[in-house]
Amino acid sequence: LATGVAATTLLGGSILVSAADDGGNTAQARTLDEIKEDGKIKIGVFSDKNPFGYVDENGDVQGYDVYFGKRLAKDLLGSEDDVEFTYVESASRVEYLQSAKVDVILANFTVTDDRAEKVDFALPYMKVALGVVSPDDALIKDVKDLEGKKLIVVKGTTAETYFTDNYPDIELVKFDEYQEAYDALLDG
């Protein structure tokens, strides 16, 4: 841990409800009537971002986003069981909507101008905070403290975009999944 590695964390998000292709056209998302006719709503969630979306020791998906998704299913279709969860990674959220693999994303997705050009967002369901996690013996209290250190980020996140755009001299170590990023932080 003393190697100067830190990790970013982002808490927050909005519901993604439809997508647009690269030309800006709305993709063929299922309509509410089609979802009701099918009897299931397909929702994308994280599998490794406790407490939001994660797989427990019994192999069951859990978390706040999962709870919220079950409530959506109950309100729309009559039962919390009328939901099919699909695991997504940060970088795959838009693609899963565009390809109709899911109807909705509940996976801590911050609204940005770039993302808003590709998908439609509902109102946010939690507040967002960007932070840095660091070892006790190498505390990061200010972005200046990151100079000369490696910063772990998850691909496709607001943290990756923020540091790439605003601090290009900070070396980013990028991972696909939150668990991989966490393990890398622990491994130093």
Q: What kind of feature is each model-predicted range?
A:
Residues K70, D82-D145:
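Acidic, polar ligand-binding/catalytic clefts
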Residues A19, I35-D38, V55-N58, Y64, ...:
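Surface-exposed loop/turn and secondary-structure junction residues enriched for glycine/proline
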Residues L1-D38:
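Short, low-complexity disordered leader/linker segments with a strong preference
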Residues V45-P51, V61-L76, T110, K127-D183:
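Bilobed "Venus flytrap"/periplasmic-binding protein-like clamshell domains
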Residues D56-D60, A100, V119-A122, E147, ...:
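Short, glycine/charged-enriched secondary-structure capping and boundary segments
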Residues K101, K150, G188:
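Conserved functional loop/turn residues at catalytic and ligand-binding sites
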Residues T26-L106:
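Extracytoplasmic small-molecule ligand-binding "clamshell" domains
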Residues G13, E37, L77-S79, R115, ...:
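Short, structurally constrained coil/turn elements
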